[in-house]
């Protein structure tokens, strides 16, 4: 933890520098960042799981305590208004005593609706950052999530501090242990539900603590890109396993995917080919490279796999140009990663929020940035047998280029995705996922 504390000092200094710059530019007194409030289920007395505002998490690892506030201006010591009620019904969060507390002036809030007493006396020139605009209006904030401030913060959040990079390495390290446990469970006959339980046990995090709903897909379920239903019963025949699952550390996410074949067969060979292609794509990452160019290169590699495994005929570029590869690989190559799984800033050309749209032929690409040092991105090429997409190919001349017998052979396996989390450095790439032990 001493290593993390050392980096945290510089992290706070950088966040203060960013705030000082944007509040000066926008002639604001400062920013008031709200952790969030509980959301009550309709007609019930139970709240949905609480998720803290990522702008709040950027400053400190208070992840599970609603009704907290940060008051920052980039000059003075940041103020943390920490919610600490008198409550015999629920567990009250302990007053923090970790290494990061020395960087904050901490005030305790015992009643959520009394926060105005602890906020700046005149907040008319302070900007509110958070979800609850109705609360901000009642408190008197006239500037609520201003576009200029949000765009600036989102653009710069893509450049990670050393503290953030270390948190993300630890999030990867934790997730790797879960992936190894899940792989073992698959080969030992566990159901989707049982694999999920073993994964969560290995990472030591509950369903509401991991950064997103895990995808635990056996056989043809792997063709559903965001499959989150967990079947309790095993399929009649065990063929394949796709797991897309991460872990959290101090609010930062990992996002890792692997695909396994139960037996050595054609599908297993396809996994090997995809793994090779993914590593080649990662080798192409460097500062100055346009992420959309990597995505287009992925389609070229998918096209070659379609030819090599006799899924399609023709030439590789023709398969890309006709949209055939998009039927087999319909999603983007990856995305920014950080405080959020699909982190902000992936389309920002500059700190004013100038938008770089995804290519018209590839609307699901989540990042169009030029790569730069200290960015963290996922690299997740895939190849799937998705009938709703492949059926579109049957409606025109592209039908003649598809080897439907091979498609039928691979359909029960669902699909393949392989995903690593990569730091772009000035002179190299750091594949956290591989370097921390997941082949």
From Swiss-Prot:
Q: Which GO terms describe its biological process?
A: proteolysis
Native organism: Shewanella sp. (strain MR-4)
Q: Top-down, what is the taxonomic lineage of the species of origin? A: Bacteria, Pseudomonadati, Pseudomonadota, Gammaproteobacteria, Alteromonadales
Kindly state which reaction or reactions the protein catalyses. Xaa-L-Pro dipeptide + H2O = an L-alpha-amino acid + L-proline
Co-factor binding details: Binds 2 manganese ions per subunit.
Positions binding Mn(2+) 2 in this chain are: 244, 255, 419
User: Which prosthetic group or cofactor does it need?
Assistant: Mn(2+)
Q: Name one GO cellular component term.
A: cytosol
Q: Provide the residue positions that the database annotates as binding Mn(2+) 1.
A: 255, 335, 380, 419
Q: Does Protease show up as a keyword for this record?
A: yes
Q: Which cysteines are joined by disulfide bonds?
A: none
Q: Which GO terms describe its molecular function?
A: aminopeptidase activity; metal ion binding; metalloexopeptidase activity; phosphoric triester hydrolase activity; proline dipeptidase activity
Q: What does this protein do?
A: Splits dipeptides with a prolyl residue in the C-terminal position.
Q: Which UniProt keywords apply?
A: Dipeptidase, Hydrolase, Manganese, Metal-binding, Metalloprotease, Protease
UniProt-listed CDD domains: Prolidase
What Enzyme Commission number does this protein have? Answer: 3.4.13.9
State if Protease is listed as a keyword: yes
Name used for this protein in its record: Xaa-Pro dipeptidase
